[in-house]
């Protein structure tokens, strides 16, 4: 069998006047993530991990932040398109593991919604998708609440 591991990373600044969307879940908060699309840091990290595992480049190669057609894009749509491309290349997803690092807001109440969205978008049972919420223990730009970071790992199997 041909197994492929992919690793993804993303970070966005928190700013006033934007919704906070993580894992496809809109989270009540006074600030949101700055980005060309909806800036869903978690879905961007997972998308990057999927493209990386399939040796298909990264999210920017497929969905450029300089392309006007992706302005304000729903990252769930981008994740589904990534999944279609990875599947067309002959891969299936074994599992997804991810971490979101945010000093605030508390993400634990939203984790199951994130898992459900990701599982639905990738055609997986929810037990094959994991999302962890972490703080940065008040250290650095994440600890000061200046942004939110996500990391993801995926395992692909060639069909």
Swiss-Prot record:
Stated EC number for the protein is: 4.6.1.12
Summarize where 4-CDP-2-C-methyl-D-erythritol 2-phosphate binds, as residue positions: 10-12, 36-37, 58-60, 63-67, 144
Q: Does the keyword ATP-binding apply?
A: no
Provide the residue positions that the database annotates as binding a divalent metal cation. 10, 12, 44
Q: List keywords of the entry alphabetically.
A: Isoprene biosynthesis, Lyase, Metal-binding
- HAMAP family (UniProt xref): IspF (MF_00107)
Spell out the NCBIfam families in the cross-references. Answer: ispF
Its name, as the record gives it, is 2-C-methyl-D-erythritol 2,4-cyclodiphosphate synthase
* Organism name: Paraburkholderia xenovorans (strain LB400)
